[in-house]
């Protein structure tokens, strides 16, 4: 298939985005919210938080009627937790080490599945009757509330092997019983691909043959970079895509973006197709318009509104407390860290955000938004009914994870530059900064990403900080072990093998 054919399909998809802001149901137009159902995602570090923020804002752009929940690991920095809480209704920390015995045991037996076991934690959100999980590297192009009409376990076929489903988007029903069965399956059988997709496919092994209604249409999990062999079908149905999935090692945040020309600069030698460049342009448009302003509002201390979302530490295998619980209730089933009591932090709504370090590195401060862009067009989070922010765990210092960046850059022009789509409704920020975050003098050091914003370029890069042996030992003694990165099982095994040789 030629690049021209892909080009036309991507253009059709962009046309869909232009017209996708209108209400799609009576409940949406009436502003109704289903409080016992939620969209769920996972962010394991500050880099993936960028994807989660874009995903959350893309969902809010299309007037979702369900709650938004993000699971995070202890590696996520204090500042990113604050910003996530401005978009998501619940920010829930998942700490496998401090979890219930059956979770801890599964992790000890299968340390290589640490990230997979973290994702499986979504089944413990039993204060919701049904959820839709979306990976942090997905982008929603239109309202997808109809996914909640599907049953467990509904997912789209994987483009590489259609008899298997892709676990980037799936419908599930939270259940502690199912969660235990999944962990038992992980301990006994592992994962044939070393990740959650292999484990879930072997657990729900009858998905391909049992119930066709649990096969989501491909438009709910369209890979942005797959070379589809049936080009007429892509041209015919590509414009109906509702969720784009950025599969592969190169994620949207690994590129650089020129806000003036709308071009994407690739950090590598490989060249992306025209249709992928168009989807990358969409991702960066949401990031520029709806995520960067959140950093700026935190930096300026402008996030003053009614108390908002829940910052919850869920680490014992039970369901996290309902975010709508009354004031004064501790976080249900939470385990406070040693020496720090689980407390309901007062917000101090009249306190300005003094002393908050800058979260971004401004290369050129003369331009923060493209010419003609109004601040009213930015989407923040809607007001919620939650009476207070509940924090049941101190915001911990993350551990750095080295990133691999090459110097070669290739400029990718978008297939069709799109005027940024502004929502018909503008939401004002409603999340107050937690008092701990405002008093933390090391927020800038804790942030594990460098955001460079200038007239001609926006980039996201992971900080690389080498720790001394003393600092590494102190981290281990404090229980802050980077199981997803430097301290991953595979890397420890490599060191042991070298030592024994």
From Swiss-Prot:
Glycans are attached at residue 228. GO terms for cellular component: cytoplasm; cytosol; nucleus. The record marks 119 as: Important for catalytic activity. It comes from Homo sapiens. It is an enzyme of class 2 (transferase). Its cofactor is Mn(2+). It is found in: Cytoplasm; Nucleus. This is Glycogenin-2.
